[in-house]
């Protein structure tokens, strides 16, 4: 008896329709694409109760002819193609004839339409779940078509319940999809409205029939986003992308849109390449981009998935390589932006004058060091500020020389005022003893070098002249490749690089000579009298390596007494130790019935209450026993996690009113999420006023921001919370800055590594872990506990 039977047509229809219409976004997508295919220039999308009650798309397209009323909802009836070969020259979004038929299968569909010749009289078509025409009514209607889908997924109970449960998330996905179509559709006006039970019809987003994609981006995402974009037009590529600078990109990749011939598609490989190219320019940030690829229809296959967003490219590798090279060239042409610090001088100096004993005293240089015109220009795009550890670079003398090169071709700062009187007197007082000490130090160096040379049978004695004629003029550092940089090893000051002409110095053999040179005030040129001997003469005198006969080596011997009984004892002891180590590192047979017990160990929070503290190891870890297992618990990480969750649960956020309220420039989806979660946002300390009469994106005004001691939060923290709520509306999010602040505070107040604990204190730390929601890691990611071994294996 045959068990293979055909599926009835009704079941086939429901199964296939469930693949095409999977959520609110896919339903809206099919309706909007039908409107675009009809040649509409104005498209209006209306949601009632987040799409749960109804979704309606109204356009001013060509309308539906009277001869198509009966077949408009039938499966695989379409006006787009007649045979498979037409796909190679396809110019429309749809081609399967499944959209309206699938919508009929999962909801109640009502179509109102009128052609150019019929308007202002139109027809209302009521379709059943099979797509058949139930009845037809004459109504007043302008040219175009309206498709309304009521009670979406009424025939699929599981999907209906999921929609009612996750309606905000599904609505956000639909709005994001409409943002993409509104962005790519030039010369077309998009309007999206939403109406709930407690509010009137609210505009979510709109465009103004713009001729350029960037204007659409400005309408949809706001001026802040559009102003951070640059055009990307190269061959098959047209569109806009974020500037490769920090501040122009975003923390998430939710605003990345790829189109092929203006069809929204998923191309993960291309998106990944764009992300990789941007990574060196903006770490941990994602660029915004809206890119359309103009590709010949014959080289792409769009008949891959029910939603037509997955495509195959015959020349994918070549296209990816072209996009990569094009984007790299675009990023390199943009240069790299460095924020200017207009309130700081281009250079900051702090002088450090070492005295004869190596101690140092900070001296102030003149505060006014005017630079050349190129350095003081307001149009400068480079701001240079020395860190505290690098400021003490200038050693003062009676006539100090300051020479700092910022970049190739940069002008040098000129000293315009004399040194302070106190600094001049101090410098004059030091100048004479300094020369005397240099001379004495040089004499001592001669003697030590002579002793060193004679003791090692070498003739490489060098002498350092006792006089060091110094030149003080302000010169630009020499480009001579023989210049040598010697680091100052003096512990009394920050290491300073000294410029010494290699052609004028004889040699330096140990740290004392380097220290002697470093104690001299910094100059651009330092000359030493004696010259380096020729290479040939130096090699002839070199006697460092001498061959020695093998029998000249020292010989050592020692008598060892060995007894047979001692060897036997050692063997027994080694065997016992080997058996013990094998038990600890036992390898279990994979066929063992209890193999999972050896590989997995489950610990529940309640187990912390039953753990017995054995003691403390290395003043950093608590050793505990639970059942047959031995654990170590990190005392600092565990206490830190307890303090962190305690601070988080008892956090009181204070708000600081803004002197001037700030109008928020938000995307439509961000604004919707903020309005839907306004009570939660206000509990986070953000005071927000809402004016529904304003245009979309500017309805919210920031009145106050949360503060905590010296930390003041801003709009970036608010946007981060909104982003989390859009993805996970059921959680209570904290901004990452607040998380870091609480983690830092918890860390500082926790038990530190190195502190000896009593048994009572160790028990308290272990018991606290049972009270936490997630006790397994500290806020910084370090695990709180580790399993050591099973006691039965010892």
Curated annotation (Swiss-Prot):
Residues 419-429 have a biased composition (Basic and acidic residues). One of its GO terms (cellular component) is nuclear chromosome. The keyword Hydrolase does not apply. Coiled coil: none annotated. PROSITE patterns: DNA_MISMATCH_REPAIR_1. It holds the Pfam family DNA_mis_repair. This is DNA mismatch repair protein pms1. It comes from the Eukaryota. Residues 352-371, 430-442 have a biased composition (Polar residues). Keywords: DNA damage, DNA repair. Residues 351-384, 409-442 are annotated as: Disordered. This protein is involved in the repair of mismatches in DNA. Belongs to the DNA mismatch repair MutL/HexB family. GO terms for biological process: maintenance of DNA repeat elements; meiotic mismatch repair; mismatch repair. It comes from Schizosaccharomyces pombe (strain 972 / ATCC 24843) (Fission yeast).
């Amino acid at each position: 008896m045959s068990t293979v039977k055909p599926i009835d047509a009704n079941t086939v229809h429901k199964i296939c329709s469930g693949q095409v219409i999977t959520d609110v976004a896919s339903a809206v997508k099919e309706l909007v694409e039908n409107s675009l295919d009809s040649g509409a220039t104005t498209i209006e999308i209306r949601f009632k109760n987040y799409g749960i009650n109804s979704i309606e798309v109204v356009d001013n397209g060509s309308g539906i002819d009277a001869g198509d009323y009966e077949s408009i909802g039938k499966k695989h009836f379409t006006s787009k193609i007649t045979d498979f070969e037409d796909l190679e020259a396809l110019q429309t979004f749809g081609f399967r004839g499944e959209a309206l038929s699938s919508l009929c299968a999962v909801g109640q569909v009502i179509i109102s339409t009128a052609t150019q010749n019929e308007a202002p009289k139109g027809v209302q078509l009521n379709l059943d779940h099979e797509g058949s025409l139930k009845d037809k009514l004459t109504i007043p209607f302008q040219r175009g078509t309206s498709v309304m889908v009521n009670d979406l997924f009424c025939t699929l109970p599981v999907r209906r319940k999921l929609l009612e449960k996750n309606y905000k998330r599904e609505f956000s996905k639909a709005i994001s999809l409409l943002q993409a179509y509104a962005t790519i559709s030039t010369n077309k006006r998009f309007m999206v409205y939403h109406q709930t039970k407690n509010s009137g019809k609210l505009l979510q987003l709109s465009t103004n029939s713009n001729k350029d994609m960037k204007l659409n981006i400005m309408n949809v995402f706001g001026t802040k986003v559009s102003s951070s974009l640059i055009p990307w037009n190269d061959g098959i590529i047209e569109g806009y992308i974020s500037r490769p600078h920090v501040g122009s990109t975003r923390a998430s990749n939710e605003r990345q849109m790829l189109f092929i011939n203006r069809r929204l598609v998923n191309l993960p490989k291309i998106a990944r390449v764009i992300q990789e190219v941007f990574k060196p320019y903006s770490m941990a940030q994602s660029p915004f981009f809206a890119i359309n690829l103009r590709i010949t229809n014959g080289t792409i296959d769009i008949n891959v998935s029910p939603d037509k967003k997955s495509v195959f490219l015959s020349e994918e590798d070549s296209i990816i390589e072209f996009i990569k090279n094009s984007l790299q060239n675009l990023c390199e042409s943009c240069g790299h932006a460095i924020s200017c610090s207009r309130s700081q001088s281009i250079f900051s100096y702090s002088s450090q004058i070492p005295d004869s004993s190596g101690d140092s005293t900070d001296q102030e240089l003149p505060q006014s060091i005017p630079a050349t015109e190129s350095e003081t220009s307001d149009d400068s795009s480079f701001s240079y500020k020395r860190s505290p550890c690098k400021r003490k670079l200038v050693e003062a003398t009676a006539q100090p020389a300051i020479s700092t090169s910022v970049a190739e071709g940069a002008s040098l700062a000129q000293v315009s005022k004399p040194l302070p009187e106190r600094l001049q007197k101090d410098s004059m007082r030091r100048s004479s003893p300094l020369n005397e000490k240099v001379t004495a130090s040089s004499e001592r160096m001669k003697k030590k070098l002579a002793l060193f040379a004679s003791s090692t049978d070498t003739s490489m004695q060098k002498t350092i002249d006792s006089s060091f004629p110094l030149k003080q003029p302000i010169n630009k550092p020499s480009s001579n490749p023989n210049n040598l940089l010697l680091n100052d090893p003096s512990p009394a000051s920050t290491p300073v690089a000294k410029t010494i002409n290699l052609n004028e110095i004889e040699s330096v053999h140990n740290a004392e000579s380097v220290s002697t040179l470093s104690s001299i005030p910094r100059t651009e040129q330092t000359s030493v009298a004696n010259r380096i001997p020729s290479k040939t003469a130096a090699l002839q005198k070199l006697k460092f390596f001498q061959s020695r006969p093998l029998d000249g080596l020292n010989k050592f011997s020692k008598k060892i007494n060995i007894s047979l009984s001692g060897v036997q004892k050692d063997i027994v002891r080694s065997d016992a130790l080997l058996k013990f180590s094998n038990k600890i590192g036992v390898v279990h047979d994979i066929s063992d019935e209890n193999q999972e017990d050896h590989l997995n160990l489950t610990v529940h929070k309640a187990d912390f209450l039953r753990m017995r503290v054995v003691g403390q190891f290395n003043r950093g870890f608590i050793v505990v026993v639970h059942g047959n297992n031995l654990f170590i618990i990190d005392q600092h990480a565990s206490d830190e996690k307890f303090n962190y969750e305690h601070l988080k649960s008892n956090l009181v956020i204070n708000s600081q009113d803004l002197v001037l309220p700030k109008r928020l420039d938000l995307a439509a989806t961000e604004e919707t999420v903020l309005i839907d979660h306004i009570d939660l946002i206000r509990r986070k300390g953000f005071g927000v006023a809402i004016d529904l009469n304003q245009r979309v994106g500017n309805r919210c005004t920031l009145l106050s921001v949360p503060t905590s001691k010296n930390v003041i939060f801003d709009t970036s923290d608010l946007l981060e919370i909104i982003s989390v709520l859009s993805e996970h509306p059921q959680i209570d999010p904290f901004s990452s800055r607040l998380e870091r602040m609480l983690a830092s505070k918890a860390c500082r107040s926790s038990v530190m590594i190195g502190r000896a604990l009593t048994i009572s204190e160790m028990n308290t730390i272990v018991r606290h872990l049972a009270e936490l929601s997630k006790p397994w890691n500290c806020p910084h990611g370090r695990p709180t506990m580790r399993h050591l071994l099973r006691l039965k294996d010892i």
